[in-house]
Amino acid sequence: MITLKQALSLSQDELETLKNEIDAKVRASDLNAYIKAPSLNGASAKGVPILIKDNISVKGWEVTCSSKILEGYIAPYHASVIENLHQNSMAGFGLSNMDEFAMGSTTESSCYGITKNPRDKNRVPGGSSGGSAAAVAGGLAVAALGSDTGGSIRQPASYCGCVGLKPTYGRVSRYGLIAYCSSFDQIGPITQNVEDASILFDAISGHDSKDSTSANLKPTQTFKNLNREKRFKIAILRDHIKDASNEVQLAYENTLKALKEMGHEIVEKKMLDSHYQISIYYIISMAEASSNLARFDGVRYGRRAQNIKDLKELYLKSRSEGFGDEVKRRIMLGNFVLSSGYYDAYYLKAQQMRLMIKEQYNKIFEEVDLIFTPVAPTSAHLFNYHASPLEMYLSDIYTIGANLSGLPALSLPVAKDSLGLPIGMQFIAKAFDEQSLLDVSYALEQELDLKLD
């Protein structure tokens, strides 16, 4: 597939040809990365075609978060990131499959069915932005937008062999993103390489008065300032690596060796056990999800139950029929931790611990430029691999720290395992220092020159 950098130099006629080619490929593909062929969404604005995750509003398109409860909902306005794409010679072209309401790590909970990993169709593409990553890796998209609440851009990028960037919280507007966990959610790019990630990030970043959590900063110019000659002081967290598979640990050590040979300084640091981060993340995210999803009641928009007797039954049946099992589980647990008698014991303590984790990151960043970790404990696993929801939650162990602290992080493919599946590693940077993330990743990408096809 042509890169985003290359596509931006095409004429309008050449772009129309490219869109027709992508549409034909999607129709012929069995990956189920797109919810439907891009042309079926209606007319697309002029510009380089960018695949959009199904929780980002595109005016006139049916946007469902891959959930039955939003069946038939037509977005009445553009998300701010879509407006930003239009201002930078790009446009939405198709909606990607995802875990329902972004609650999952495998893209198995979508009401549209599973998405397959293009590297091995018997394996998951990761999630929740699995459709976006599978499409980019499978040659079905030039680039894509995803959202990252606990690793939902970085983990599928790692599983599929793409570059995935979670920007600093507040760097990219969330206006028009259908919320899962408002204090964690962030929109970001999934691309074929670091240059494309930089270009797409620059296009969507910047202050937005319609988002009260948007940082009052100008759009970034990371692509213009990309510098692979810069050298950094990079921290590693040895205690956190024990949960990774042997092959991920080997890829980690080999990448560390490459970073040292490139002239970067590696130092060891310590943090609170990452298992605590899992508990904190899920308490807070489920609490916020139970609040955010209360609006889907069958009255205002989306699916409405039929043959009901009264308003109470309308609420009950609409939500029971519309939400999938994982979403129901998180709503119930979220209501539990917010209930009288448990708010102080769980939610309040989790928020206090979240602040402590953020302070730990800030302390480390007083002495280093970047932190280097795996993205996931393993490479992409088979479908129906997790015996319990808890096992799936533990797969986020390396990614959720950046969300808890609002820091930017980037996933880069660095190796292949014994089955030829991609393995990604992650850099985390100080708040609003995406430039350093992209600089070090750009240099490492050039150094490793990994061939996945």
Swiss-Prot record:
Pfam families: Amidase. It is an enzyme of class 6 (ligase). The keyword Transferase does not apply. GO terms for cellular component: glutamyl-tRNA(Gln) amidotransferase complex. InterPro entries: Amidase, Amidase_CS, Amidase_dom, AS_sf, GatA. It catalyses: L-glutamyl-tRNA(Gln) + L-glutamine + ATP + H2O = L-glutaminyl-tRNA(Gln) + L-glutamate + ADP + phosphate + H(+). It comes from the Bacteria. Its EC number is 6.3.5.7. GO terms for biological process: translation. The keyword rRNA processing does not apply. GO terms for molecular function: ATP binding; glutaminyl-tRNA synthase (glutamine-hydrolyzing) activity. Keywords: ATP-binding, Ligase, Nucleotide-binding, Protein biosynthesis. The active site is at 53 (charge relay system), 128 (charge relay system), 152 (acyl-ester intermediate). Belongs to the amidase family. GatA subfamily. PANTHER family: GLUTAMYL-TRNA(GLN) AMIDOTRANSFERASE SUBUNIT A, TRANSAMIDASE. Allows the formation of correctly charged Gln-tRNA(Gln) through the transamidation of misacylated Glu-tRNA(Gln) in organisms which lack glutaminyl-tRNA synthetase. The reaction takes place in the presence of glutamine and ATP through an activated gamma-phospho-Glu-tRNA(Gln). Heterotrimer of A, B and C subunits. NCBIfam families: gatA. This is Glutamyl-tRNA(Gln) amidotransferase subunit A.
